[in-house]
Amino acid sequence: MTPPGAPKYVIGVDFGTLSGRALVVRVADGAEMGSAEHTYRHGVVTEALPGHPEVRLPADYALQVPADYIDVLRFAIPEAVANAGIDPADVVGLGTDFTACTMVAATSDGTPLCQLDEFADRPHAYAKLWRHHAAQPQADRINALAAARGETWLPRYGGLISSEWEFAKGLQILEEDPEIYAAIDRWVEGADWIVWQLTGRYVRNISTAGYKAIRQDGKYPSRAFLAELNPGFASFVEDKIEQPIGRLGEAAGTLTAQAAAWTGLPEGIVVAVGNIDAHVTAAAADAADPGRLIAIMGTSTCHVMNGRFLREVPGMCGVVDGGITDGLWGYEAGQSGVGDIFAWFTKNCVPKEIAIEASRRGLTLHEHLSELAAEQEVGEHGLVALDWHSGNRSVLVDHHLSGIMVGQTLDTTCVDQYRALLEATAFGTRMIVETFQRSGVPVEELVVAGGLIKNPLLMQIYADVTGLPLSCVTSTQAPALGAAIHAAAAAGEYRDVPTASARMGGRTKNAFTPIPENVTRYNALYAAYVELHDWFGRNNPLMRRLRVMRSNAERRETVGSAQ
């Protein structure tokens, strides 16, 4: 127990795509005292199951091993506390955030099915990472049926349900491995599963229930709708996902003895209701007011913002009452690939001599390419790209789309291509901004968080392309800070999350502002982007046909290697 007068601390743990990060934060002012990161031992499983190299995975699979999440608690939290130099007894609360929609197939006590010997060689027993896109056929059927039936919840998701979400992934398991589906007692969001492990209580957070499980106005899709999709899916809600709902900033429970042993924290401290990594960042930015579009830029980008009123926005990921901040409508959009695209390019498309020069200068490839690209005038490279290398989340909601670059000649360089890809992701964000604005949801400020904030060229491009002032979240670990702020509210240290955020969060306002001549030039490039966007994304099935060809070829290769 914290002695009277001693400083109080909370810990936020951010479970990302490749690693988990723990951050120790002082309750009084949000000072970040110490942190630590633990990389998932198994990373993202995309080719073969761990320990079962003979089990090859089809295209678009992205799985994880839930035991890796527990290792974050065991290693990152004690290390962060040690780095902070504080007494663990002074920690009063713990908050977490998670990628979403990342799903764990579990038994009734929370044990992941992949940890059971009889299911260790079954892909559908493993956690499905947010970027598992192999359920697109199921998502297509959900969308078609919902539209045909006039389901009232569909417009709140922009008219389309994503293959990344709970129902599409669950239906895929039913149809591809019915035995695993039958063995699933709880189909659990990673955000809730980790809180379950910490507290011994399974509480569904209102955010993922709304954004990823189609819960609107207190209800999930009807039994009749699910039965029409597949008779075996009729009881999916009551059998697999229905659970008491916890609001953001509330306590989900307290730390169990086992979790205290893992973390080195006091047994009985408050654990906040789980949250989504993007949405929790609003608290870290102190940007919960309507009109602030927060872009959390990493491997992908998630865009979140609050509004005072309910609006139905085409192609958005959803709108949920209290989904970001209690008492406001929380809107979500996103881009499936951003940092992933830049990483792919530097890994596969940069000549050796460029890499050698970057190394000689003591720069990363990204830094070197960005410096060279910054020397160009807007439009100098003559290129326009589509940022769909991981599909399109908003506004087309189609993960069978793919990337493209138009305008290449024999004079085109890798620097030209790199800048075009940076710009393509900014154009994707502008498409989202304009869709919000046309739907009656005003956007007045772009607030950026995440690792890509360190690239000044990219930030200026985003300001110029969108025409918006761009603010930068002060913390370099914004999701973890946001989780810690929610922990402070859950522990009763502040009246609510906005009050805690005002004391503990913050952003550098107007860090980048639009350059008028660049805005004008980018308007012309953006018009070309919109042409490509609509032709390839709305009016032509070419990209889908190419995906089918690829899948068929991989299927033949898998069959051939098995014979």
From Swiss-Prot:
GO terms for molecular function: ATP binding; D-ribulokinase activity; ribulokinase activity. CDD domains: ASKHA_NBD_FGGY_L-RBK. The keyword Transferase applies. GO terms for biological process: L-arabinose catabolic process to xylulose 5-phosphate. It is an enzyme of class 2 (transferase). Its EC number is 2.7.1.16. Pathway: Carbohydrate degradation; L-arabinose degradation via L-ribulose; D-xylulose 5-phosphate from L-arabinose (bacterial route): step 2/3. PANTHER family: FGGY CARBOHYDRATE KINASE DOMAIN-CONTAINING PROTEIN, RIBULOKINASE. This is Ribulokinase. It comes from Mycolicibacterium smegmatis. The lineage of its organism: Bacteria, Bacillati, Actinomycetota, Actinomycetes, Mycobacteriales. The gene is araB.
